[in-house]
Amino acid sequence: MDIERKIELIKKKPTEELLTEENLRHLLEVGAPLQHYIGFEISGYIHLGTGLMAGAKIADLQKAGVKTRIFLADWHSWINDKLGGDLEVIQKVALTYFKEGMKQSIKVMGGDPDKVEFVLASEILDKGDYWQTVIDISKNVTLARMLRSITIMGRQMGEAIDFAKLIYPAMQVADIFYQGVTIAHAGMDQRKAHVIAIEVAQKLKYHPLEWKGEKLKPVALHHHLLLGLQEPPVWPIESEEQFKELKTQMKMSKSKPYSAVFIHDSPEEIKQKLRKAFCPAREVKYNPVLDWAEYIIFREEPTEFTIHRPAKFGGDVTYTTFEELKKDFAEGKLHPLDLKNAVAEYLIELLKPVREYFEKHPEPLELMREIKITR
């Protein structure tokens, strides 16, 4: 596969940002090993924004010949008070429910879960030289910068935090260099940590990325954050700037069950959540149902997406591109309820293998149901 095709696959939806394409091209041209990683806190049920968005991108990366890795961030989850801040529980969930859920998500999005390496953070944090890397990074970043970066944890700037949380951004950056990662992957909400990684890359003494005597910068790949199904905290949204400010609050959240569809939700739960979804008629800019259609259903174009309607409401209609769907919705030719029902049916069918897996292997899900889910 040539370099242009590899770049095309890596940039494909749901990629929203690549820092930078020039650096990626350089890594490909010099023949540097392409090692991907995406790190996850272990914090509750896997929703589509985690499972399907990451799974889709992992599938693309595999097709481009990249080695893929999922980093199960148990210590980071402990620092961020996930699952009651119980490290033992976090580790148990990471190696059962979360690992299996991500494998099934990757599979339904066209990837090969057997080609994904799963690494528990404890496996590398127990090594003494990991902490040398954390200190090395910390010496190259100001305290003010670290404080601004705590938003990667879902925390607000200015929020009262314990000191452990200040170590978190440096640990996340260290994870990249210590594992020899050349493609650091996450949702757009993790951007601040990745920018630090790029900026300190050529200053590090411990575990820098090196290839044939050259210190390399990692590529940061950020995928789209699916909008939550709930109404935005402010409506109407007056400007693109206001939308950017609200976007993190509008993303799917496992602590707000009706904002998210989980990978193992029943058909009835999926229908119910989509029925309640915020989907104003003719609204195409800030519409979570259209957002899901664009990034899940129309990730590959052309495709065939059929909306079934009674003849008196126009009968069945099939769309092959997202722009066709968006245009009809904007012009009022497609009713919100018809769109919601069709998206629900698509998701029910897409997630069927995941449901079947957890029906045959119920123990991981039963474990999750017994555990208090924290934000």
Curated annotation (Swiss-Prot):
Has the keyword Ligase been applied to this entry? yes
Q: What is its EC number?
A: 6.1.1.1
Q: Which GO terms describe its molecular function?
A: ATP binding; tyrosine-tRNA ligase activity
The reply to whether Protein biosynthesis figures as a keyword in the UniProt entry is yes
Q: Which residues bind L-tyrosine?
A: Y37, Y168, Q172, D175, Q190
Q: What GO CC annotations are associated with the protein?
A: cytoplasm
Which Pfam family, giving just one, matches this sequence? tRNA-synt_1b
Q: Where does ATP bind?
A: K254
Q: PANTHER family from the xrefs? A: TYROSINE--TRNA LIGASE, CYTOPLASMIC (PTHR46264:SF4), TYROSINE-TRNA LIGASE (PTHR46264)
Q: Which family does the record claim for this protein?
A: Belongs to the class-I aminoacyl-tRNA synthetase family. TyrS type 4 subfamily.
Q: How does it assemble?
A: Homodimer.
Protein name as annotated: Tyrosine--tRNA ligase
The species is Thermococcus kodakarensis (strain ATCC BAA-918 / JCM 12380 / KOD1) (Pyrococcus kodakaraensis (strain KOD1))
